């Protein structure tokens, strides 16, 4: 008999340890009571059943035999829940294996709070500890929860956890038995097939649970292992035939805690004593010892999302004077402050001015919703003033979102009283964006183009601050002030704010925020109007841009209304563009292109305009530039580009950060600008989808050999082109992994003749993917073969570039996390789904818990998993067939 066919077991009477049971998760929905029940018992409104999030349930566990309890019940520790109930906690029962009778069963009751000092059962379930053959249960079990009753420990029980009363439960029971047989070695184990099978079983179980009217509690029983061998626990009782007396049980008395959820007076007193003014002089000269210093360094290195414990907060406060020389420690110190205590807040603000100035990138954290003190926020703005315009432009999208956390009254008070004689010069520049005249005072928005005066001022990179500026500026004043000095900043600030003003969702859901953005636009318009001649030119050019975009939107609507096929729509598009009397788009006065204001355009070339083959039919347009050249763009109407705009901004930022570390990965961060929630511009890059390359040329290497041949290069390809391809593959693999970009297929991977590979279409981010079981990164067999295969030097270089890029970006993780934290309230689809988890999703991809060496090994495993992902290859073929039949 082989080793695998042997059955290893141990008698229950010989296992002198306590029984342990793991409480996993609770699946299913709780039904709310009827209105009649609420009227009869008003306390129901204050129960966990009516909380917006998952109520704070707890589970009690007690062992019974013959209807009598064998020990006192144990319960799970307190744990708050947000979206699902998941305790994931091992309970040590006060009974040992030798003390268990053959008919022992465990009763599990789920409880919810019901007013002060009261609890009601959510449901109960009971399961025997030994199976029908006397084997102690092992592994995970899904137990049916009987609603609104306590678990019944009698025999037979009224709350059985293992039943097969329905067809779906028969299916779950059958799969559980098969899983058990596999675990016990009764089936042949095939690793790759087992992984797919267990995932499918898990999906079936989840589906059956959702379709059921019951809730299910997942529990896990301990497995016994010795020398890597799994042992079954068989019931056996020495001298079992001899009779023995049974102890009588007493009624258990539950003692409610009246102080639960109330203020802990001891902790409050300790907090006030630790932060009192008397401790200030003594704390001033405190120096930590080596152990405490290491602990402080660990706290300072925490990511922005890390919540400090009370002990850590007290430690940071105690050594606050020592930490004033560490700029990275400031945000951690401010998290320790209780701003509701005036004396403590006063101490913190006094120390803020003495702290070593923090980096500009770190100051973004102080503009998030977690920091509401106006002095702290203005300190962050003061640090932002040290950033040059180029850096400020990289954060501008997030800074516009950070206005949501400013004091709205301060923004409104910054408006100047309007004069009647200025009303004649205003226009309805926002009318096409969906903002009605009732919402906007027409004298306070961007005006019609003024007579041309002089060219706008060039972009400035100066860090100096003029003497006339107020050092106590709020964020709104700061952004407007800087925008008035830089035409590029003014351009993007205008369009970012316009989109927020036009957002109908914000207008309906949060009218105060909508009104705030309108006030920002009014203040911006006033500031431009008050400026000198060059600043007023900026204002007129912005109005001209708005007029140009309005006409373009009107044109696209007319084309979409045109009946017929794409050819007829193309003809209609070109005809309308050529009609200067109706549209006036082909020949306009020189204006900056909203997408890239450094490019000055004179109009659109009608004969080159065309529509793409897609549902929304975006238009490819060629703009005539100031120097007589062409600038190709894609104008999309009917699509919200804000998500693409965010991802391309982050990719552009990452490219800049990597270049700062002397790592050029040949990325292609093309420009995207949403001019509304329904339309916007995208830069057009001449390229070919990888799917088309494979169809026409057979392989990526054939494509390169066709356009960049070389007798001396690798595989007959120019060495420069191959190097560009390898680096761009590495860059986008790492970046799309960090951002959780989904729906990756060969049609949204594009390739240029110079070897640059880049991604488009970012409709799924932060881990969302319409395809099942997606690989961690898009790296398929065809892409690897384009490098020469897994044994080639180019592939090894690709892996090295991935490791290097990942390590560099990890060092800038705080900046990236701060930028995402400012976007949590933006109406971006994949962020709006779970805004509270957005930053955590990105942080998890960085694996900040690993050392650099461990991070390299982790990236190695991700690459290997992606290259050998079998299911992803199957999905790619399905997508290919779908595209074929669509055509």
From Swiss-Prot:
Q: Which residues form the C2 PI3K-type domain?
A: 35-184
- Show the ranges annotated as biased composition (Pro residues): 449-459
Secretion signal: which residues?
Answer: none
Localization, UniProt:
Midbody; Late endosome; Cytoplasmic vesicle, Autophagosome
- Residue ranges of domain PI3K/PI4K catalytic in the record: 605-871
Q: Biological process GO annotation list?
A: autophagosome assembly; autophagosome maturation; autophagy; cell division; cellular response to glucose starvation; cellular response to starvation; early endosome to late endosome transport; endocytosis
GO CC field: autolysosome; autophagosome; axoneme; cytoplasm; endosome; GABA-ergic synapse; glutamatergic synapse; late endosome
The segments labelled Activation loop in the record are: 759-780
Q: Which cofactor does it need?
A: Mn(2+)
Q: How is it modified after translation?
A: Ubiquitinated via 'Lys-29'- and 'Lys-48'-linked ubiquitination by UBE3C, promoting its degradation. Deubiquitination by ZRANB1/TRABID promotes its stabilization, leading to autophagosome maturation.
Provide the assembly information. Component of the PI3K (PI3KC3/PI3K-III/class III phosphatidylinositol 3-kinase) complex the core of which is composed of the catalytic subunit PIK3C3, the regulatory subunit PIK3R4 and BECN1 associating with additional regulatory/auxiliary subunits to form alternative complex forms. Alternative complex forms containing a fourth regulatory subunit in a mutually exclusive manner are: the PI3K complex I (PI3KC3-C1) containing ATG14, and the PI3K complex II (PI3KC3-C2) containing UVRAG.
Q: What does this protein do?
A: Catalytic subunit of the PI3K complex that mediates formation of phosphatidylinositol 3-phosphate; different complex forms are believed to play a role in multiple membrane trafficking pathways: PI3KC3-C1 is involved in initiation of autophagosomes and PI3KC3-C2 in maturation of autophagosomes and endocytosis. As part of PI3KC3-C1, promotes endoplasmic reticulum membrane curvature formation prior to vesicle budding. Involved in regulation of degradative endocytic trafficking and required for the abscission step in cytokinesis, probably in the context of PI3KC3-C2.
Protein's name in the database:
Phosphatidylinositol 3-kinase catalytic subunit type 3
> Gene behind this chain?
Pik3c3
């Amino acid at each position: 008999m082989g080793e695998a066919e042997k059955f290893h077991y141990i008698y229950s009477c010989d296992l002198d340890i306590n029984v342990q049971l793991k409480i996993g998760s609770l699946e299913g929905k709780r039904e709310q009571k009827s209105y009649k029940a609420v009227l009869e018992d008003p306390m129901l409104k204050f129960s966990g059943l009516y909380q917006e999030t998952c109520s704070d349930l707890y589970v009690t566990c007690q062992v019974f035999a013959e209807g009598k309890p064998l020990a006192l019940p144990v319960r799970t520790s307190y744990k708050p829940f947000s979206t699902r109930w998941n305790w994931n906690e091992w309970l040590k029962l006060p009974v040992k294996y030798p003390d268990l009778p053959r008919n022992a069963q465990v009763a599990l009751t789920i409880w919810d709070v019901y007013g002060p000092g009261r609890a009601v059962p959510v449901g109960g379930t009971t399961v025997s500890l030994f199976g029908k053959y006397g084997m102690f249960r092992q592994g995970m079990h899904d137990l049916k929860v009987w609603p609104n009753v306590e678990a019944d420990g009698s025999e037979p029980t009224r709350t059985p956890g293992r039943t097969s009363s329905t067809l779906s439960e028969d299916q779950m029971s059958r799969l559980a038995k098969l899983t058990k047989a596999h675990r016990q070695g009764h089936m042949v184990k095939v690793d790759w097939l087992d992984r797919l099978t267990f995932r499918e079983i898990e999906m079936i179980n989840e589906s059956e649970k959702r379709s059921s009217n019951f809730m299910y509690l997942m529990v896990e029983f301990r497995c016994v292992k010795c020398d890597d061998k799994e042992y079954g626990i068989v019931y056996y009782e020495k001298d079992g035939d001899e009779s023995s007396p049974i102890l009588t049980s007493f009624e258990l008395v539950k003692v409610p805690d009246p102080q639960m959820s109330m203020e802990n007076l001891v902790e409050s007193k300790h907090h006030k004593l630790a932060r009192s003014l008397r401790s200030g002089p003594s704390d001033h000269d405190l120096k930590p010892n080596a152990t405490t210093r290491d602990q402080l360094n660990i706290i300072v290195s925490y990511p922005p999302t890390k919540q400090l414990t009370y002990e850590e907060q007290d430690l940071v406060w105690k050594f606050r004077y020592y930490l004033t020389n560490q700029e990275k420690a400031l945000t951690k110190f401010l998290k320790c402050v209780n701003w509701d205590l005036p004396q403590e807040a006063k101490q913190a603000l006094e120390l803020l001015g003495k702290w070593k100035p923090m980096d500009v990138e770190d100051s973004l954290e102080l503009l998030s919703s977690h920091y509401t003190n106006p002095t702290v926020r203005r300190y962050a703005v003061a640090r932002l003033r040290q950033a040059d315009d180029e850096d400020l432009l990289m954060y501008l999208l997030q800074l516009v979102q950070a206005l949501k956390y400013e004091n709205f009254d301060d923004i409104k008070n910054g408006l100047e009283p309007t004069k009647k004689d200025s009303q004649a010069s205003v226009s309805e520049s926002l009318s096409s964006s969906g903002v009605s005249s009732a919402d906007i005072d027409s004298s306070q928005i961007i005006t019609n183009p003024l007579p041309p005066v002089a060219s706008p001022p060039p972009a400035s990179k100066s860090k100096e601050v003029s003497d006339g500026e107020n050092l106590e500026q709020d964020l709104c004043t700061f952004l407007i002030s800087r925008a008035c000095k830089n035409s590029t900043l003014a351009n993007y600030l205008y369009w970012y704010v316009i989109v927020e003003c036009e957002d109908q969702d914000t207008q309906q859901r949060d009218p105060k925020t909508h009104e705030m953005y309108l006030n920002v636009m009014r203040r911006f318009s006033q500031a431009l109007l008050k400026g000198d001649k060059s600043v007023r030119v900026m204002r007129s050019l912005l109005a001209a841009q708005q007029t140009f975009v309005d006409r373009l939107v009107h044109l696209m609507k007319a084309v979409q209304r045109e009946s017929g096929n794409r050819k007829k729509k193309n003809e209609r598009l070109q005809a309308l563009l050529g009609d200067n009397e109706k549209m006036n788009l082909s020949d306009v006065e020189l204006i900056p292109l909203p997408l890239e204001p450094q490019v000055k355009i004179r109009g659109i070339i009608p004969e080159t305009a065309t529509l793409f083959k897609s549902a929304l039919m975006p238009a490819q347009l060629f703009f005539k530039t100031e120097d007589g050249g062409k600038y190709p763009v894609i104008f999309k109407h009917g699509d919200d580009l804000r998500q693409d705009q965010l991802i391309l901004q982050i990719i552009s930022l990452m490219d800049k950060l990597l270049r700062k570390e002397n790592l050029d990965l040949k990325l292609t961060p093309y420009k995207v600008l949403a001019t509304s929630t329904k339309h916007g511009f995208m830069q057009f890059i001449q390229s070919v989808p990888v799917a088309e390359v494979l169809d026409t040329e057979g392989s990526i290497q054939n494509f390169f050999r066709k356009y960049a041949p070389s007798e001396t290069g690798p595989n007959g390809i120019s060495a420069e082109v191959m190097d560009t391809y390898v680096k761009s593959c590495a860059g986008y693999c790492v970046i799309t992994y960090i951002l959780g970009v989904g729906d990756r297929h060969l049609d949204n991977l594009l390739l240029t003749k110079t070897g640059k590979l880049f991604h488009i279409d970012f409709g799924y981010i932060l881990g969302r993917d319409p395809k099942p079981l997606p690989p961690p990164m898009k790296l398929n067999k065809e892409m690897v073969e384009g490098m020469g295969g897994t044994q080639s030097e180019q592939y090894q270089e690709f892996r090295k570039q991935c490791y290097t890029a990942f390590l560099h970006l990890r060092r800038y993780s705080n900046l990236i996390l701060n930028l995402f934290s400012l976007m949590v309230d933006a109406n971006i689809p994949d962020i709006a789904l779970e805004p509270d988890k957005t930053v955590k999703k990105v942080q998890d991809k960085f694996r900040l818990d690993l050392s650099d060496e461990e991070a390299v090994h982790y990236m190695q495993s991700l690459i290997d998993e992606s290259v050998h992902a079998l299911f992803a290859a199957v999905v790619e073929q399905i997508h290919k067939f779908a595209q074929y039949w669509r055509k």
